[in-house]
């Protein structure tokens, strides 16, 4: 669905406007309006479909992302192989569907142009893909209180990548994105390898950076990012305890009066503690004693 919507927008943007080689460079790729139009279409389509399918398959539509998850020890190899196969088949189906439904040729193939060599295009694809994958690692793979917004960040990362790469390589960032239209068109450009080598190198770069951050325990550099230090939303009976908890987290000395008042309200460290019931002293009484428990005859 992601690629079908994106390919359709490319076709709507005009035949031979982008991604079509005429001489040595894509035609019309310098038009800012077209660049923004294509970039917005790909990023919004990806963000929406990641949000839809996040609970189903993890919202993965990119073999480079799948490989990076394997390298980051976040996905088994067998499952990754099945995902990559499904992604490639889906890209062919999406390109074929767009070509069959819309009039004229699809014109969604990517190609290196505008004075850029294939090697330069490969490295550009590598860095742009690495940026996208690092965004996925830090927003979706690493769980935090803003994880539910990960699709927005992923979509924006793809948007920026398209702004940079469309003019030079068509901004694939995804082997499946370049493979599907080539199969549907029945023609592979000689630089097709750029759109496999570049994104997969980006997978290694992003996974290596992610594992380095995990090894260095990046959480310690900026701790307590997921701790809610706001007491305004707490109930009145809990605000004293919340204030004491916040001061303790920030390393400040907590006045004894604050803790005592917090305990009086049956709240300690932000959690309710049931009041202790008074204990009745136990007095041992001998069976042969004629005295009562108060000590009087």
Q: What is each stretch, according to the model?
A:
Residues 1-297:
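Membrane-interface helix-loop junctions and terminal tails of multi-pass membrane proteins
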């Amino acid at each position: 669905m992601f690629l079908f919507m994106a390919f359709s927008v490319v076709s709507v943007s005009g035949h031979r406007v982008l991604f079509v080689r005429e001489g040595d460079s894509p035609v019309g790729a310098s038009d800012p309006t077209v660049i923004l139009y294509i970039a917005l279409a790909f990023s919004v389509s990806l963000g929406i479909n990641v949000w839809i399918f996040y609970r189903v398959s993890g919202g993965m539509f990119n073999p480079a992302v799948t490989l990076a998850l394997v390298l980051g020890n976040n996905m088994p190899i067998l499952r990754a192989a099945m995902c990559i196969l499904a992604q490639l088949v889906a890209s062919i189906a999406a390109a074929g569907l767009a070509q069959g439904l819309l009039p004229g040729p699809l014109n969604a193939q990517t190609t290196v142009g505008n004075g850029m060599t294939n090697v330069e295009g490969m490295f550009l694809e590598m860095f742009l893909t690495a940026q996208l994958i690092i965004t996925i690692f830090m927003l979706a793979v690493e769980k935090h209180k803003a994880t539910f917004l990960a699709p927005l960040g992923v979509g924006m990362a793809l948007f920026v990548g398209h702004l940079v790469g469309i003019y030079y390589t068509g901004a694939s960032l995804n082997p499946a994105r370049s493979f599907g239209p080539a199969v549907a068109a029945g023609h592979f450009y000689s630089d097709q390898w750029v759109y496999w080598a570049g994104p997969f190198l980006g997978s290694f770069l992003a996974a290596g950076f992610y594992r380095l951050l995990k090894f260095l325990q990046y959480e310690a550099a900026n701790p307590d990012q997921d701790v809610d230090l706001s007491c305004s939303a707490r109930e009145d009976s809990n605000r004293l305890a919340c204030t004491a908890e916040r001061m303790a987290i920030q390393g400040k000395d907590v006045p004894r009066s604050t803790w005592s008042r917090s305990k009086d309200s049956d709240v300690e460290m932000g959690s309710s503690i049931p009041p202790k019931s008074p204990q009745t002293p136990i007095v041992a009484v001998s069976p042969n004693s004629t005295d009562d428990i108060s000590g009087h005859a």
